[in-house]
Amino acid sequence: MWYTSTRGMAPRVNFEGALFSGYAPDGGLYMPEELPRLDEETLRHWSTLSYRSLVKELCALFIGLELIPRHDLNDLIDRAFSRFRHRNVVHLCKLKNGLNILELWHGVTYAFKDLSLSCTAQFLQYFLEKKKKHVTIVVGTSGDTGSAAIESVQGSKNVDIIVLLPKGHCSKIQELQMTTVLKENVHVFEVEGNSDELDEPIKAVFADVAFVQRHNVMSLNSINWSRVLVQMAHHFFAYFQCTPSLDTHPLPTVEVVVPTGAGGNLAAGCIAQKMGLPICLVVAVNRNDIIHRTVQKGDFSLCEVLRTTLASAMDIQVPYNMERIFWLLSGSDSQTTRALMEQFERTQSLQLPKDLHNKLSEAVTSESVTDEAITQTMARCWEENQYLLCPHSATAVNYHYQQTDSGQSSIRCCLASASAVKFPEAVQAAGLTPETPAEILALEHKETRCIPMRRGDDWTQMLRVTIEGLSQRWKDCVVNPSE
């Protein structure tokens, strides 16, 4: 399996090359050159598999056996999921009036990012141990990615991780999950800006291809193909858990409602759709509605300001995985994708070509949800089911309530991206009582460590200097291993 850049100006790479990259050298994102097409017989067989086994089957399609033999791949995935709190890793909760919620948050940090990051970290370690290499991971977070990435690699001798978090834009618990990890290989920066602003120095660093290669810099954000690959399993498992029968022809369709920020989970769903999974995708966003406007009107343009919402991990104006979706739906047209993304980067405004917009609106429907609707949905779900939603998952459930209230009776699965325990402020805003586990309460009493990135500082230079220092430290350790 080979991977190509969405912008078509970079050499193709294998899975290992895509794994150890951030952006491709031409600024694009890696995608498989060809997608396997799954027939109904394969889907029927996969429908009998556990989530864990489904991840193994999907990864085996996209990772060459010459890179990771199948028995090694199975072991890595088992190891990745060994610390999840639920024995099935993920869990489908069936509630009243056809409300199906796929709980993706049973990992260590209570967010769906644990699923893909735990696997990706295992793949990384596999290659690093073989080659005795060191990498520096750079991650920008709007809340959940940072803690899940830290958890997946903390304490690793041949990995350093740098996380940039947006000061005042995460929940207190999200922030503490990052700043209380004091391992020597974890380096957290608190940025005086929002999640889109902190992405700028990261993209600037990755634009210097020679620097990235010299210091072995990579990303664990969902620009990393491995993240998207594992997230495809969410959609397959949601379909198999919710469809009443796979004995009919054609196979029945299931709506999958995806709370969305940077669009990695949405891109994974679009790829699954292209592979033959009969799902209808619904993207649920908060008031930062660029994806909603793109689906509805073809308007892929920034608003003047980023809005702060209760669904803070989705407070994103630049959903970079839309580039993957544009490439996919344009028939792998890298020339068109490159022109579109370069225009967007230059002007922060883009009107999709009519044919591409038509294909997008056929593949995906969308909704934008206010904070008021989020809290109303959280309150209603508790009243009807005694079930606490996180504010992000509530954007998906809000769509379900809208459809059922208007008499629409499709089979539907709402993806629950995080546990409500991470967002007590939003739970209280909905008039409900937070449920906080002891391990979360204990965060308040732990020592914290982070480095400020203030407005007026040169954030890109700070990042470069940190990377250079970590790279030099590794070289010193190799030369003087006893020190």
UniProtKB/Swiss-Prot annotation:
Pfam families: PALP (PF00291), Thr_synth_N (PF14821). SUPFAM superfamilies: Tryptophan synthase beta subunit-like PLP-dependent enzymes. The keyword Lyase applies. It comes from the Eukaryota. The keyword Lyase applies. It is an enzyme of class 4 (lyase). The modification N6-(pyridoxal phosphate)lysine is found at residue 113. Acts as a catabolic phospho-lyase on both gamma- and beta-phosphorylated substrates. Degrades O-phospho-threonine (PThr) to alpha-ketobutyrate, ammonia and phosphate. Also degrades O-phospho-homoserine (PHS), but this is not its physiological substrate. PANTHER family: THREONINE SYNTHASE FAMILY MEMBER (PTHR42690), THREONINE SYNTHASE-LIKE 2 (PTHR42690:SF1). This is Threonine synthase-like 2. It comes from Mus musculus (Mouse). The gene is Thnsl2.
